[in-house]
Each structure stands twice: as structure tokens, then as C-alpha cells.
């Protein structure tokens, strides 16, 4: 059969095109491109040609694309010449970039959203695995195409295009079963280049290439919500070289094991390749064919085309291809870099009406200034951890950034999907707590409450150094052992309500080494209750002044010892009352004196003196209602001095 090539151009927006030359390049997970030179018998209007479809059909094999470039070349003879660069619709994503946040979506859902937002629908997902939800995924300063590419690579999803006249479809998959055979006859003969006529649609040269690759993959990661979990995954063999990146990009062990398994396939996919030339126009990236009639029978197997370039020079057509055994599980390499994030700032956001919006881990949400889609509420970001000066199991420092504060956001390993708040900064809306530069010597911590603030403030101004503390409401201090306070000058306590001091067990000592002590109760009472013994020792004078009544009540004995004199002076009546016996004893003389009457009244009254008893008055009367006895054991003398009168109903003298 003669070696003839038929090429046809179909473009709804451009008529009368005749192909002159054509070159195309395509690869798995690569953007295909085609350059077509054409002639027309009449001039074309190129202004509306961009982004319109053009299909190049080479020997019944279609290559469809959108015109990305249109060039008007110098005319030759009666023909106008043009050149068109064709690209797939996916290439248009390289023309747009974005900064946005995706939350709680799988990689497939994110990619579909990007496609939808760009207005493209010609794609098919043939994914067997189920990509997990991503709590937080950031697109930052990268084209939509690069963003989509790296997400697909992270999930081990490869992609290629299928073509027909007027349409090309993006196929996204993660298993070799998604690769279709080439169009037409899937068996392609090996027919080495030779003179004379030859059959078209055959492989003209084929070269087997083997290369060393890593035979194993291992990686680790860290999940702060399960900090003790051993997140380590490994697959393949160490002896052939082990690829060991960190972090691995997984948060669960099962996820890591699955990732390691397909990462090994991605490493091994390039180990064995068939590189050749053919004039089979049906060869296309992502399609497989069966090689036949090769002298090396081991090569007569199914081959998957991973890259191919077609070339038509106006007379002759040929292509160059690279293929791997179809039986080799194919996964893409991770070649699209993640943006490396540097430190940024953001505003803390949360639910409307709240002052603080946080969770059990003290995380907050933020709105980045570049995020045009965020609503500055609790949906603007994922929960971001907040770095503190100290953290531990139930201890450490805790300061939760409030809604409206500007925070400094870093990214662990520069990963846009791993933000971490490392601090807070002031701005034009959030002023410092101590106005500057007037208070440049002041520093401290000042919080904010609905009605005021709590504060710990330091002032290092010379000769005015100060440490000030304020509790907006209650203040609690707990000391589990000793507490010692040393004050080198004055101390002032002012309590506007109650004050209670309790010493549960032990002693209390108050020592005033020099000076006076005054307790002034301006209004109210003073109560002292001692349930055991109380001692008061005053080495100098003590004076009591009571403006009203004073009452002492003693349930036991009452003893008053005075080394000097005791004077009791009462403006009114002095009453001494004993429920039993009243004893008055004097070591020397006992004097009882009254300016009026002095009365002794009792059932029996005895006056006894060891030496003599003298009763002296102007008149002394001894009167008994029954019997009055005057008796002396030895001698009794009754002397009237002047007159002695003894009177009775009967008087006996014996």
C-alpha cells in the first residue's frame, strides 16, 4: 500500500482551510499543543478566531483544540498563508490565577468547582478510589491549571484527552482500566524502515530503554489531633533505593499506606520504556496498542503511550512516541510544586454577635486580605491553631485572639494547607493599650471585657517604677504552701464591702515593731470570738474608753490581779452581787465609807477580829427581835462612862 497521508482541517469559524504542515505534542498529565499551517484562497478575518475550535484529522484520527494563537504569514502566489496554535480547553486555566479557600471538599470536588467556574464541562472522572475530604485547601498565587494539577498529582490521578471532530474530552482516572485502545485497529505492526513501498500505520523503529528508579517509598507525617499516633507508611523495597519525603501528606495510617503503594508505582512507571517512530497516526497519549511482528517476541505486548509527537511536513507524516507496558500500573509523578507560603497577617473572624469564636483546642478562624470570596464570618477559614508562650497537658499560657484582632499567620513547612497563628499585631483600628510615645516605659497585659478590663501593668519610668494589677470583677489567689510579702514602705488596703480572713489550722501573728496601731470602726460593731484561751499582754499602760454600756459575761471564774492600786469609780450605783458567798479580803486595812448610810443585810452577819473589834458612833443600837446575846469567854466589861442603863422585863445579873 502506498504511503499516503490525508489531513483535513475543520474550523466552524474559519472556512476554506487547506493544511500545509502540522505538528502536535501530547503526554500523560501534560497539556497537548498543535501547530498547524494552512492556506486559503481568500483572506480570513482573524479577530474572532481566538478560542474557536479547529480539528485536524490525520488519516481518520482527530486532534481537536481551541485556537490560542493565529498568525498571518506572507502570502505565496494566489494563496494566503496562516499559522494556528491549538491548545485544549484545560490550557485556558493557565491564563487565570486565584487566591481562595476551599473547605471540607475532596480533591475531585475542588477540581470540578474550578472547571465549573471557568465554564468548562468536557471532562470525565473515572476514579476508583474515593478521595477523602480536605478540611482546608488553599489556592495561593498560582494559576488555576497549576492548582488543579498539583491536587490531582497529590491524589495519584492521571489525565489525558480523547478527541473527535469538534470536541475533546479530559479523562481523569487512577487506574489503568481507564486507558482506551487507540482508534481503529489496536494492533500495530513492527515494520522496520526499508526501501520501496511500505504499509502505512506501522512502527518503523522501536528501542527498549531500561533505567534505574527508586524501588521503595516511605514517609511520615503528624496529626496534632492525635499526637501519639505513629503516622509512618512504607511500600516497595529498600535495596533498590528508597524515596523518603516528609511530610507525607496524610493524617491517618490507612491513608498513608494507600499513598505509599501508588507512589511506588509512580516511581517504577519509568523503569521500562519503548521509544520509537511510526506512521500510525492513531497513537495518542493515554491510549494503548498491541505491538506485533517484532523480532524480539518479548516486545509484542500491549503498550501504553505516555507521550507522542506527530509531524506532517506537507508530504510525509511520522511520529515519535514513548510507551510503557500496559501491565505496569501507572501513576503520575508529583511535579507541580506547592506554593511556598511566607508569613502573612489576617483578621480574626467568627460568628456574628460573638466577641470570641473558638473551639476546644483554642483555635480561631481568620479572613485573609486576599480572600475575595470569604464572608468574614465563621466560614472564612478552617480552625487555625494558635502558638503560645507555653503549652502542656492542662497547663501553659492561654490567650485566645478575639474577633477583629490582626494576627500573624505562618505556615508549617511553608505548606498553604497548614496555617499556624504565631502572634498578634496592632493596626490603625486596634490601638495599643498604653498610648505611645507618652507611655513608652509601660508594658504589660491588658484584657478586654464587656464593661472594662483585667490588667497586669509595669512601668519602668525612673523614680516612678510601678507594678499595677486590676481585676475587673473578682480576684482569686491560691497559694498551696507558704506566702511571703515584703513591703519596704507603706501598705494601704481599701475594701468597700465585706472582708473575711480565715486561718484554718495554725497560728496568726501580727507584729508591730515600732509605731502605733489604730483600728477605727466608724459605723457598726466589733465582735471578737475566741473558742479557746485568749491572752492579752500590755507592757505599758492600757486605757479603755466606752461611750455606752459595757458588759462582761464570764461562765467560769474571773480573777483580777493588780500589782499596784485598784480604783473603781462609778458616777451612779455600784452593785456587787454574788450568787453564793461574797468575800472581801484585805492584806492590811479594809475601809468601807459612805457619805450616807452604810448597811449590811443578811441572814447572819458576823464581825470577827483576831485582836479587837471597835464600833464607834454617836449612837450605837443593837436590836434583836428575839434574843441578843453578848458573851465573853474570859472577861466582858460594860462601862457606861456616865450612866449605864440596863432595862428589861426581867433583868438577871449572876
Regions found by a protein language model. Name each.
Residues 24, 52, 75-76, 105-109, ...:
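Extended, domain-scale alpha-helical bundle/helix-rich regions
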Amino acid at each position: 500500500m502506498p504511503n499516503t497521508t490525508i489531513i483535513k482541517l475543520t474550523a466552524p469559524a474559519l472556512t476554506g482551510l487547506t493544511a500545509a504542515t502540522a505538528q502536535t505534542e501530547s503526554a500523560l498529565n501534560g497539556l497537548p499543543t498543535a501547530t498547524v499551517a494552512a492556506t486559503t484562497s481568500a483572506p480570513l478575518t482573524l479577530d474572532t478566531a481566538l478560542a474557536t475550535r479547529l480539528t485536524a484529522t490525520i488519516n481518520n484520527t482527530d486532534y481537536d483544540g481551541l485556537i490560542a494563537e493565529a498568525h498571518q504569514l506572507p502570502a505565496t502566489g494566489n494563496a494566503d498563508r496562516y499559522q494556528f496554535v491549538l491548545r485544549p480547553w484545560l490550557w485556558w486555566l493557565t491564563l487565570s490565577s486565584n487566591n481562595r479557600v476551599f473547605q471540607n471538599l475532596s480533591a475531585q470536588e475542588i477540581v470540578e468547582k474550578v472547571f465549573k467556574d471557568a465554564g468548562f464541562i468536557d471532562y470525565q472522572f473515572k476514579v476508583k478510589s474515593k478521595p477523602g475530604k480536605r478540611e482546608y485547601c488553599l489556592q495561593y498565587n498560582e494559576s488555576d491549571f497549576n492548582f488543579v494539577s498539583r491536587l490531582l498529582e497529590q491524589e495519584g490521578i492521571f489525565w489525558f484527552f480523547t478527541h473527535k471532530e469538534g470536541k475533546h474530552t479530559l479523562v481523569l482516572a487512577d487506574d489503568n482500566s481507564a486507558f482506551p485502545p487507540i482508534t481503529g485497529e489496536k494492533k500495530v505492526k513492527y515494520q522496520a524502515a526499508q526501501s520501496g513501498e511500505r504499509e502505512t500505520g506501522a512502527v518503523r523503529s522501536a528501542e527498549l530503554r531500561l533505567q534505574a528508579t527508586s524501588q521503595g517509598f516511605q514517609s511520615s507525617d503528624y496529626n496534632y489531633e492525635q499526637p501519639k499516633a505513629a503516622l509512618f507508611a512504607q511500600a516497595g523495597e529498600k535495596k533498590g533505593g528508597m524515596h523518603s519525603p516528609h511530610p507525607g501528606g496524610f493524617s491517618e495510617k490507612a491513608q498513608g499506606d494507600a499513598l505509599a503503594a501508588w507512589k511506588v508505582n509512580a516511581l517504577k512507571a519509568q523503569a521500562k520504556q519503548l521509544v520509537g517512530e511510526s506512521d500510525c497516526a492513531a497513537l495518542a497519549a493515554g491510549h494503548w496498542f498491541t505491538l506485533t511482528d517484532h523480532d524480539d517476541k518479548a516486545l509484542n505486548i500491549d503498550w501504553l503511550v505516555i507521550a507522542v509527537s506527530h509531524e506532517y511536513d506537507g508530504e510525509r507524516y511520522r511520529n515519535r512516541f514513548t510507551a510503557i507496558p500496559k501491565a505496569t500500573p501507572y501513576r503520575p509523578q508529583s511535579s507541580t510544586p506547592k506554593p511556598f507560603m511566607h508569613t502573612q497577617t489576617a483578621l480574626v473572624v467568627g460568628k456574628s454577635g460573638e466577641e470570641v469564636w473558638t473551639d476546644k483546642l483554642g483555635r480561631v478562624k481568620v479572613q485573609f486580605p486576599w480572600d475575595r470570596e470569604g464572608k468574614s464570618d465563621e466560614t472564612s477559614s478552617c480552625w487555625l491553631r494558635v502558638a503560645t508562650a507555653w503549652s502542656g497537658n492542662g497547663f501553659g499560657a492561654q490567650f485566645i485572639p478575639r474577633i477583629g484582632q490582626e494576627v500573624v499567620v505562618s505556615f508549617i513547612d511553608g505548606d498553604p494547607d497548614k496555617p499556624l497563628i504565631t502572634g498578634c499585631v496592632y493596626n490603625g483600628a486596634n490601638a495599643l493599650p498604653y498610648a505611645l510615645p507618652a507611655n513608652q516605659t509601660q508594658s504589660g497585659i491588658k484584657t478586654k471585657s464587656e464593661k472594662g478590663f483585667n490588667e497586669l501593668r509595669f512601668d519602668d519610668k525612673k523614680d516612678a517604677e510601678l507594678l499595677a494589677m486590676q481585676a475587673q470583677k473578682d480576684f482569686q489567689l491560691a497559694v498551696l504552701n507558704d506566702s511571703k510579702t515584703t513591703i519596704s514602705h507603706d501598705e494601704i488596703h481599701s475594701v468597700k464591702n465585706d472582708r473575711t480572713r480565715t486561718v484554718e489550722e495554725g497560728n496568726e501573728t501580727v507584729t508591730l515593731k515600732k509605731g502605733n496601731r489604730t483600728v477605727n470602726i466608724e459605723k457598726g460593731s466589733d465582735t471578737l470570738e475566741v473558742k479557746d484561751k485568749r491572752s492579752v499582754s500590755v507592757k505599758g499602760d492600757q486605757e479603755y474608753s466606752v461611750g455606752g454600756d459595757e458588759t462582761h459575761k464570764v461562765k467560769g471564774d474571773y480573777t483580777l490581779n493588780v500589782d499596784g492600786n485598784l480604783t473603781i469609780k462609778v458616777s451612779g450605783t455600784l452593785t456587787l452581787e454574788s450568787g453564793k458567798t461574797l468575800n472581801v479580803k484585805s492584806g492590811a486595812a479594809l475601809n468601807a465609807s459612805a457619805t450616807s448610810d452604810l448597811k449590811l443585810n443578811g441572814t447572819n452577819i458576823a464581825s470577827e477580829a483576831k485582836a479587837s473589834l471597835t464600833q464607834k458612833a454617836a449612837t450605837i443600837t443593837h436590836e434583836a427581835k428575839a434574843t441578843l446575846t453578848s458573851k465573853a469567854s474570859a472577861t466582858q466589861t460594860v462601862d457606861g462612862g456616865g450612866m449605864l442603863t440596863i432595862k428589861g422585863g426581867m433583868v438577871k445579873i449572876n
